[in-house]
Amino acid sequence: MSTAKLVKTKSSDLLYTRNDLDEKVKLAAIKALNHQVVQFIDLSLITKQAHWNMRGANFIAVHEMLDGFRTAIIEHQDTFAERVVQLGGVALGTVQVVNDRTPLKSYPTNIHSVQEHLKALADRYGAVANDIRKAITEVEDEDTADMFTAASRDLDKFLWFIESNIE
């Protein structure tokens, strides 16, 4: 019984896998997936920053709501990273990579009110939701598109909840 070699072939940038998707489709999907891994890591950290540092009316409701959002975001980021590896790529999720590649605006660390945090979160959730929605139609790997669709549904719901709490 032979086992898969966990080395790159001379003609490919990918690790060996028996997944028979076209290499160009794999490479494009890996690029799109790693982009989302970066955004979702950043969004999860931003969410926790707000969760820890907000004060004011509706604090506990929003505080607890954000915990649920972060849990779902982390699950999606894990799914994306695992798909990268399934396709023969390397998942890129270090703090250094996220810092270098995130398209999200830097999150303000000098805000404190629930309302200020909700507005800052809405901007960033909206940016990621709009970006992943676009990625759904661009990626040619149907499994990756399905993963993006599931994440898009969650982000749209989370954005709705955030916006519904803005006064």
Curated annotation (Swiss-Prot):
Keyword annotations from UniProtKB, A to Z: Cytoplasm, DNA condensation, DNA-binding, Iron, Iron storage, Metal-binding, Oxidoreductase
SUPFAM superfamilies for this protein: Ferritin-like
Reaction(s) catalysed (UniProt annotation): 2 Fe(2+) + H2O2 + 2 H(+) = 2 Fe(3+) + 2 H2O
Classification via InterPro entries: DPS_DNA-bd, DPS_DNA-bd_CS, Dps_gammaproteobac, Ferritin-like, Ferritin-like_SF, Ferritin_DPS_dom
GO molecular function: DNA binding; ferric iron binding; oxidoreductase activity, acting on metal ions
E.C. numbers: 1.16.-.-
Subcellular location(s) per record: Cytoplasm
Enzyme class: oxidoreductase
Keyword presence, Membrane: no
Biological processes annotated in GO: chromosome condensation; intracellular iron ion homeostasis
Keyword Oxidoreductase (UniProt): yes
Coiled-coil region: none
Residue sites binding Fe cation per the record: H51, D78, E82
A GO cellular-component term linked to this record: cytoplasm
Family: Belongs to the Dps family.
HAMAP family: Dps
Subunit and partners: Homododecamer. The 12 subunits form a hollow sphere into which the mineral iron core of up to 500 Fe(3+) can be deposited.
Function, as annotated: During stationary phase, binds the chromosome non-specifically, forming a highly ordered and stable dps-DNA co-crystal within which chromosomal DNA is condensed and protected from diverse damages. It protects DNA from oxidative damage by sequestering intracellular Fe(2+) ion and storing it in the form of Fe(3+) oxyhydroxide mineral, which can be released after reduction. One hydrogen peroxide oxidizes two Fe(2+) ions, which prevents hydroxyl radical production by the Fenton reaction.
Descriptive protein name: DNA protection during starvation protein
Source organism of the structure: Serratia marcescens
Gene transcribed to yield this protein: dps
